[in-house]
């Protein structure tokens, strides 16, 4: 019986080691992801709404819980933002998504991939907008428009 118990213990420790659950860094992993998520939130919360004099945080378009960070590998992270427009027919939801993307691409200090979505069920055309704000070519084309670029620049400008 003792032999079986020892074999079981060895097998379990081996499985945990192979799965990465017993690595010293594994316990730090959730804390690191939380820290990265807070870092992301700190950057996006001060983005100004294109129509109103408020920030996205003040309007509750973004919150700490709308940011998720996952590790892709040791040097790169997947950042997922799910924002909530103020009304289901918000005509500027695409512009808000563009502002989020531009600010994070410019300011995030770590290597990342970025996915930005409208929170499910919060906008009448969320699928179309999600496609637009995650399409690199459409984002690049939008930023080539001088009028649109100026609006984005005003929204992402850091407050004094």
Curated annotation (Swiss-Prot):
Pfam families: FeS_assembly_P
Residues that bind Zn(2+) 2: 89, 123, 150, 153
An example Gene Ontology CC term for this record: cytosolic [4Fe-4S] assembly targeting complex
Top-level taxonomic group: Eukaryota
Subcellular location: Cytoplasm
UniProt record, GO biological process: chromosome segregation; protein maturation
GO MF term set: metal ion binding
Binding-site residues, Zn(2+) 1: 89, 123, 150, 153
Subunit: Monomer and homodimer. Component of the CIA complex. Interacts with CIAO1. Interacts with IREB2. Interacts with APAF1.
Family to which this protein belongs: Belongs to the MIP18 family.
Biological function: Component of the cytosolic iron-sulfur protein assembly (CIA) complex, a multiprotein complex that mediates the incorporation of iron-sulfur cluster into extramitochondrial Fe/S proteins. As a CIA complex component and in collaboration with CIAO1 specifically matures ACO1 and stabilizes IREB2, connecting cytosolic iron-sulfur protein maturation with cellular iron regulation. May play a role in chromosome segregation through establishment of sister chromatid cohesion. May induce apoptosis in collaboration with APAF1.
The protein's name in its UniProt record: Cytosolic iron-sulfur assembly component 2A
Organism: Homo sapiens
Lineage: Eukaryota, Metazoa, Chordata, Craniata, Vertebrata
């Amino acid at each position: 019986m003792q032999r079986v118990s020892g074999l079981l213990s060895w097998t379990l420790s081996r499985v945990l080691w192979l799965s990465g659950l017993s690595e010293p860094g594994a316990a730090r992993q959730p804390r690191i992801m939380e820290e990265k998520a807070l870092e992301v939130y700190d950057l996006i919360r001060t983005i100004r709404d294109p129509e109103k004099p408020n920030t996205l945080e003040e309007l509750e378009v973004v919150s700490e819980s709308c940011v998720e960070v996952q590790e892709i590998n040791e040097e790169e992270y997947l950042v997922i933002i799910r924002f909530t427009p103020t009304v289901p027919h918000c005509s500027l939801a695409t512009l808000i998504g563009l502002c989020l993307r531009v600010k994070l691409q410019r300011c995030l200090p770590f290597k990342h991939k970025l996915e930005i979505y409208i929170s499910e069920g919060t906008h009448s055309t969320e699928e179309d907008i999600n496609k637009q704000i995650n399409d690199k070519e459409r984002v690049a084309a939008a930023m080539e428009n001088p009028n649109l670029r100026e609006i984005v620049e005003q929204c992402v400008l850091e407050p004094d």
